[in-house]
Amino acid sequence: MCIRVSSKGMIIGMNRLGEAFSANRAFVPEMLMAARCMSAATELLKPLMVGEGTEPVGRVCLGTVKGDMHDIGKNLVRIMMEGSGIEVFDLGVDTSAEQFVSTAVENHCGVIACSSLLTTTMEEMREVVKLVHERGPQDQIKVMVGRAPISQSFCDEIGADYYAEDAGAAAREAVAILKAQKAS
């Protein structure tokens, strides 16, 4: 029953709102309000979902890069991802490349999702990509980047695997990545 409430109601609603946000038909206040509702509902349902055999789509390691203390966008991404059935390891703000990679490796995360609001901290994303290539199983861990100053060209320049323009796109892309990883 709880899975049906989540998958047939809450997740569909958040996905539709994410699509509206991507198309500039919904705005940050609506996203924040829906995110708070989703978070509260998820917390209420969690105890009831234990034992229902819910298997997450996959795991994502999420955080704001070192030097950046902004978390509103990251929190929206977390809620959208959780609402899409992803298990999220939220590292918070000011997260080093080492923290991202070690958490992803230890917890078998298929995606590292990095956020940066400041142009002065964007370069830390390059360090995350570099460390994944040095230490992580790069065929198993994909790096996604996003937030206001980030673009597809920056993503390509630093060698990240995916760029997400907003929270809805991040959740949709992560689901697609994780499902493809499970299928292979």
Q: What would you call each of these model-derived segments?
A:
Residues 163-164:
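A structural signal for hydrophobic residues in beta-strands of small regulatory alpha/beta folds
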Residues 31, 77-84, 89-160, 169, ...:
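Cofactor-cradling patches in redox/metallo enzymes
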Residues 171-184:
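A charged, well-structured terminal subsegment
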Residues 6-9, 120:
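A generic short alpha-helical patch detector that favors 3-5-residue windows
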Residues 1-3:
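Short, small-residue-biased leader/transition segments that mark boundaries at the very start
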Residues 8-73, 80:
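Long amphipathic N-terminal alpha/beta scaffold segment
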